[in-house]
Amino acid sequence: MSFQALLHNEAMVQALAMQEITSPTAIQEQVIPLLLEGRDVIGQSYTGSGKTLAYLCPVLLNTDASSKQLQTLILAPTHELVIQIYRQAQLLCKNAKLDIRCQSIIGEANINNQISKLKEKPHLIVGTPGRILDLIKKRKINCQTIRTVIIDEMDNLLDNTNQQTVQEIIKSMLRDRQLAAFSATASNHSLDILAQQMNEPAFVKIEDQAKMNPNIEHFYLISEQREKFVQLRKLLHALDDEAQRILIFMNDGPELDFLVDKLNYHK
């Protein structure tokens, strides 16, 4: 199936093409029509399968840009994922010429700046649950106008650490809102919680025989700590001719900033 047949919106199809995304993945083929119809959805698919676009495209197309109300809330567990989703939403809006206002809200950012930004009446918010709940309690986010809630990385957000916060956010909204949740895994614990909050959800599970995106090659290098940066630079130079985009994952924010500075210096 083509994006034209799925989305029925040429501007969005062209926006995807500008990112060299021309054919839908399996999760996108199944999820996009369901979300466009307003169904609640649980989507389980392997990392790299295109889950973010599976919900972003229909969510943006369902947004009433003429309204000044918040319509969509996307919850993600980490600051990095929030920013990634937010930037993808912004890019789609720009390239599809959608007059939709998006805002990212993360815990480490200045809350007063976020409150000021909320006065611009975003249609879509992407955020981490803790700060989102803070702003709801401060009555800076009106949950009564939200029509769609997306939970990204549901097993992470519905674990014992985040479960109460996420449930409190969802309960602050109208019951007839649309709720969708996505992850590479779906524990019984997460599914039990979602069953209490969803209305006859469609469950979409994409099996992957290799348990990974077939277009991703896995290998690892063992290196002394002092040699890591040198090895990373060699690897990046080796991949430079064949890789258009390269993602580097780290588990430490300050170290990440330091690495970016070093890579820029040693171009």
Which residues does each PLM region occupy?
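Conserved helicase RecA-like core
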Residues: 2-267
